[in-house]
Amino acid sequence: MDLQLKGKNAIVTGGSAGIGLAITKALAAEGVTVTVPGRSKEKLNKALAGIINVKAIVADPGTAEGAAALIQQVPDTDILVNNLGIYEPKPFAEITDADWLKIFEVNVLSGVRLSRHYFPRMLEHNWGRVIFISSESGVMTPPEMIHYGVTKSSQLAISRGLAELTKGTAVTVNTIMPGPTRSEGIVDFLKNVSSAPNPTPEQAEKEFFEKHRSSSLLQRLIESEEIASLVAFISSPLSAATNGASLRAEGGLLRSIA
């Protein structure tokens, strides 16, 4: 299928690792010129080596200064994928104000700052795609990291609110809700929540789904490419009828039918 994306421009935050890297590759393969911001030029170059149609920019969208630097270097884009995010399992009573502020700034304000600039321009051009990479945690708050769940819920609200402003235009704003996905850091996360003292990655994954995500129909980690393929379609002109949606790619974790 031709997604009709050739010649478009995209920004993918957090686009040099995990789900973000898979999204970068998927869009680039469709002929999109993808800009990937990051904190380290060396790490960006290493992660993006060999990918056609990609540009690395040293700027951290997780800070106000970094977002401003990115906007200065790339004033316009057709597609904005707000993928940047962090997470940390932590008992609720131990989550400090600093923890709350940090995760909110990275997970929520990074997308707010960039959308505040690029979204009005998309409306002016009468075409654009804003995509927030949220999580099933946005509607099924994980007790092991409540602060993370709050940020993912916030993304759902922001996305739907922006979509309401697109009425009658060719701009769409949607959210993707991945479930637990195989990416950098997931092995350590699974070990941290495991009851075993030193589980193998396979044991930790099995226990996680049995104890913490028992409603999953997939009963395994999702591969990053399985998320990226959905993002590529939602980025496409072919997805024009999908707007203001929270799209599930969580392996059937959520039991509701709507």
Where are these regions (language model features)?
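Conserved glycine-rich cofactor-binding loop
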Residues: 9, 16-17
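Substrate-binding pocket helix/loop in short-chain dehydrogenase/reductase
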Residues: 91-92, 99-104, 212
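Active-site helix of classical SDR
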Residues: 115, 151, 159
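Alpha-helical segment proximal to the catalytic Tyr-Lys
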Residues: 120, 164-165, 240
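Residue(s) in the substrate-gating loop at a strand-loop-helix junction
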Residues: 135
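Short C-terminal tail/terminal secondary-structure segment
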Residues: 140, 232, 243-258
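Short, small/polar-rich loop/turn modules that mediate ligand/substrate recognition or access, typified
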Residues: 167, 172, 242-244
